[in-house]
Amino acid sequence: MTESRSHSRRVWIKADSDVGDWKTRKRRITTGLEAGVDCVLVDPEDISRVQSLGDVSIAAFTSTADSETDSSAETEGVEEADTVVIGKESESDGTDDFPETLSASADLSAIETHSNNTVVETGAYIRILSEEYEALAETAAADASYTIVIGEDWTIIPLENLIARIGSETTLIAGVTSAEEAQTAFETLEIGADGVLLDTDDPDEIRETVAVRDATERETLELEWATVIDIERAGMADRVCVDTANLMQHNEGMLIGSMSRGLIFVHAETAESPYIASRPFRVNAGAVHAYLRTPDGGTAYLSELQSGDTVQVVNTDGQTREAIVGRVKIEKRPMFRIELEYDDDRVETLLQNAETIKVNTQSGRTAVTDLESGDEIRLFYEETARHFGEAVEESIIEK
C-alpha cells in the first residue's frame, strides 16, 4: 500500500508480537488507523490481516538470516510490505552479542544487501543501549531508508546526537510511548526527528500523538489589516462554494482573492442566519477566477478544485490546518467587488452579494452587505508573484 498523502512528520505504530496477542494488536492497529497514523509496524504473519483492516503503509520485521539468504525479501508475506525492517531479535536490539567491529555486523550486511537488491524499502531497528549502538545506527543510516531508534533513556542518550549525525541521511524514526515524548522528538534541536514509532495501547495517547504530528506541520500566518476603499455591485458571475469534509470552527475560514499577493479571510458559514441554517463545512469563496491558498503555501483557482483536493483552513489568529474538499458548487450569483488598500498597494476580490458571506473586521464577524469604505478587514499579504500557483521571482502585474 502507499500513503494517500504524505506527511513531513510521520507517526508509526508498533504492533508486533511484543505487544500481545492478535486481539490486542488488532485493537492497537484499528485505533491507529482511525486516528490517522502513517504506518503500522508488524511481524510478517500479520501483513494480510492489516491489509484487510484498511489502506495504510505497512512495515514488517524480518530476521537477519532471511535478509541475507533472500535479498528480494520473499520470505512468507514480507514481500507484501512497503518496508522491511531489520534488527529485531538480533544484535541491533541487544538480543545477540554486539559485533567486535561494525564491519562484522550481520545486521549492517543484511541492510546493505537488502537495500541494494529490492524495490521494497529497508528499515533499520536499533535499541540505543550505549554509544556503540549510536555508531551502529549512524552506519545503518547510510543504506536504510528508515532508521528506527529506541532510546532506553533519552535523557542519558540524547536524541540530539542522532539527529545531528544521521538526520539528513535517512528518515529518522524515534521510539516513543506517549504524545508528550512525541512532541519532544519532533522539537529536538529545532529540526526534530522525521517521525515517531509509538508503542502504547492507550487510545487517547495514539490520537494525541497524531494531533501532535499535525500541529508540527501547521504554519502560522501573519494576517494584516487592510482598509476597504471601495465596494460596489459587480453583476452576475459564477460563484464557487467550497464544501469540505471537515467541520470548521466559528473563527475559521479560507484565504481568497483575485490577486495572489493579497488574499482576504472569508469566514466559514458557521453562524446561524434568519434565512438559512448554518453550514459549518462551507466557505462561500467567491468567483471562479479567484485564488485560494493551499497547504503547501501555493494557490489554486477555485474553478479547478474538486472532491478529494486538500485546502488550507485558517483562523483569525493565522493558525492553519488542512481540510478535504468534499464538493464544489458553482452557481450564478450577484457579486460585490471589494477593493482594499494595504501598505500603499491595492488588492481586490469578488464575493457574493449576500448577508451570509462574512469577513473579519476590527468589529468582528461582518457580512459583506454591511461593509463600508474605511472598514479594516483581515488580509494575508505577501510580496511575491505566482505562476501556476507557485511563487516566482518575476514581475507580474495583477489589476
Curated annotation (Swiss-Prot):
Keywords of the record: Amino-acid biosynthesis, Aromatic amino acid biosynthesis, NAD, Oxidoreductase
UniProt EC number: 1.4.1.24
Function according to Swiss-Prot or TrEMBL: Catalyzes the oxidative deamination and cyclization of 2-amino-3,7-dideoxy-D-threo-hept-6-ulosonic acid (ADH) to yield 3-dehydroquinate (DHQ), which is fed into the canonical shikimic pathway of aromatic amino acid biosynthesis.
Protein's GO biological process: amino acid biosynthetic process; aromatic amino acid family biosynthetic process
InterPro entries cross-referenced by the UniProt entry: DHQ_synth
KW NAD (keyword) present: yes
GO molecular function annotations of the record: 3-dehydroquinate synthase activity; dehydroquinate synthase activity; NAD binding
Uppermost EC category: oxidoreductase
Gene: aroB'
Name listed for the protein in its UniProt record: 3-dehydroquinate synthase
Reaction catalysed by this enzyme: 2-amino-2,3,7-trideoxy-D-lyxo-hept-6-ulosonate + NAD(+) + H2O = 3-dehydroquinate + NH4(+) + NADH + H(+)
Organism: Haloquadratum walsbyi (strain DSM 16790 / HBSQ001)
